Curated annotation (Swiss-Prot):
Entry similarity comment: Belongs to the CpcE/RpcE/PecE family.
Assembly: CpcE and CpcF associate to form a lyase.
UniProt keyword annotation of Cytoplasm present: no
InterPro entries: ARM-like (IPR011989), ARM-type_fold (IPR016024), PBS_lyase_HEAT (IPR004155)
Organism: Synechococcus elongatus (strain ATCC 33912 / PCC 7942 / FACHB-805) (Anacystis nidulans R2)
Keywords attached to this entry: Antenna complex, Lyase, Phycobilisome
Name under which the protein is recorded: Phycocyanobilin lyase subunit alpha
Annotated signal peptide: none
Gene: cpcE
Taxon lineage: Bacteria, Bacillati, Cyanobacteriota, Cyanophyceae, Synechococcales
Cellular component, GO, one term: phycobilisome
Length: 273
């Protein structure tokens, strides 16, 4: 919310720029960075100010982190600007875990293959180095985000590094490794490991598996997705991810006709509405 309590849509581009430029109110700056990304404001001025915000040291969280840097990093991933890639790579060395995580995800959105060496550095030491930190809600590195981004970037050089994380003691790390390896190798064996998450006793893990399968577009998982004990809204999102991936792989003529797989997917989606 802005200072006046107006909804997001009521903030203008000019107000967002002014709020991000000033330094007296950190809350307004934080919100402005989010707003610029949320509404895809790709003007050079907005991008330049968001890049500048990646070095902000005025807005500090109780945990010592940098909230404005986090929002700026997230926003830049949505703005399709190559200028943001080098500054985001630099953010991978920030002491704030959440800045590293946001930068990692944005580099994936930007398809920044040049970031692969820096991303691999975050996984140095293997599974043993990615561990819990006493008193913190996160691990030493955002390994799940790193592996997912490596998968997005089709960084096949990362395969042996990521394979080691299939044996990590934390479920979400193993799931991220399997998702990444399917994207990197196309081997169904890895996708089936993600499918197993649909029957996990914990709802959050089932939700994660749904989102992962939608992201990788693993078509054989469609029936299991539809039957998963989770919200229909999430199952629909996952199935739409499968359908989108399937259609991208078809010729325009095939899309016009709709093959059996596409029709079956749409039938499953109709059943969830």
């Amino acid at each position: 919310m802005s200072e006046a309590g107006t909804p997001a849509e009521a903030l203008t581009y000019e107000q967002a720029i002014a709020n991000l430029r000033q330094t007296a109110d950190t809350g307004d700056r934080y919100y402005a960075a989010w707003w610029l990304g949320r509404f895809r404001m790709k003007q050079p001025e907005a991008i330049a100010l968001l890049i500048e915000a990646l070095d902000d040291s005025l807005d500090r969280a109780p945990d010592g982190g940098y909230p404005l840097r986090r929002n700026a990093a997230r926003a830049l991933g949505k703005l399709e600007s190559p200028e943001a890639i080098a500054p985001l790579i630099a953010c991978l060395q920030c002491e704030d875990y959440y800045v590293r995580e946001a930068a990692t995800q944005s580099l994936g959105e930007l398809q920044a293959t040049v970031a692969v060496p820096a991303l691999l550095k975050l996984l140095e030491g293997g599974p043993e180095a990615i561990a819990a930190i006493p008193g913190k809600p996160h691990l030493t590195q955002p390994a799940d985000a790193v592996m997912e981004t490596l998968g997005q970037l089709r960084a096949t050089v990362a395969v042996p590094v990521v394979q080691a994380f299939l044996e990590h003691p934390i479920d979400k790390i193993r799931l991220a490794a399997a998702r990444s390896l399917y994207q990197l190798t196309g081997d169904d064996h890895y996708a089936e490991r993600v499918v197993q998450g649909l029957s996990d006793p914990k709802l959050q893990r089932r939700r994660s598996a749904l989102m992962d399968l939608g992201a990788i577009g693993y078509l054989p998982a469609a029936p299991q997705i539809a039957q998963t004990l989770a919200e229909n809204s999430l199952k629909l999102i996952s199935l739409k991810g499968l359908l989108d991936t399937h259609l991208r792989q078809q010729t325009p003529e095939a899309i016009a006709e709709l093959d059996e797989s596409a029709i079956a997917l749409m039938d499953l989606m109709d059943g969830l509405l």
